[in-house]
Amino acid sequence: MTEQIEKVRRALVGRVVSDKMQNTVTVLVERRVKHELYGKVITRSAKYHAHVEDGGAAAGDLVEIEECRPISKTKSWRVAKVLEKARVI
């Protein structure tokens, strides 16, 4: 009975839009929803502050974030992994 049960955490995929803060990135998460009345597919977006260790993600990277305990007033997410690095032209 000493087994630890791992909680199922919510995970989202988004693009890093800002990495100017220390140990924090701003992630833009977009989702497509159908309008209830007119049926048109529209894009909804939300920005989340996510905790990142040692500059693991930079602006433009595609990252997966997962929910965690509140780290600060606005941070309750952390970067789980970097899915795709930003391309430099």
UniProtKB/Swiss-Prot annotation:
GO cellular component, one term: cytosolic small ribosomal subunit
GO molecular function, one term: structural constituent of ribosome
Oligomeric form and interacting partners: Part of the 30S ribosomal subunit.
Name of the gene this protein is made from: rpsQ
Database matches in Pfam families: Ribosomal_S17
GO biological process, one term: translation
Disulfide bond sites: none
Family, per entry: Belongs to the universal ribosomal protein uS17 family.
Name of the protein described by the UniProt record: Small ribosomal subunit protein uS17
InterPro entries, per the entry: NA-bd_OB-fold, Ribosomal_uS17, Ribosomal_uS17_bact/chlr, Ribosomal_uS17_CS
Keywords tagged on the record: Ribonucleoprotein, Ribosomal protein, RNA-binding, rRNA-binding
Species, as recorded: Aromatoleum aromaticum (strain DSM 19018 / LMG 30748 / EbN1) (Azoarcus sp. (strain EbN1))
Purpose: One of the primary rRNA binding proteins, it binds specifically to the 5'-end of 16S ribosomal RNA.
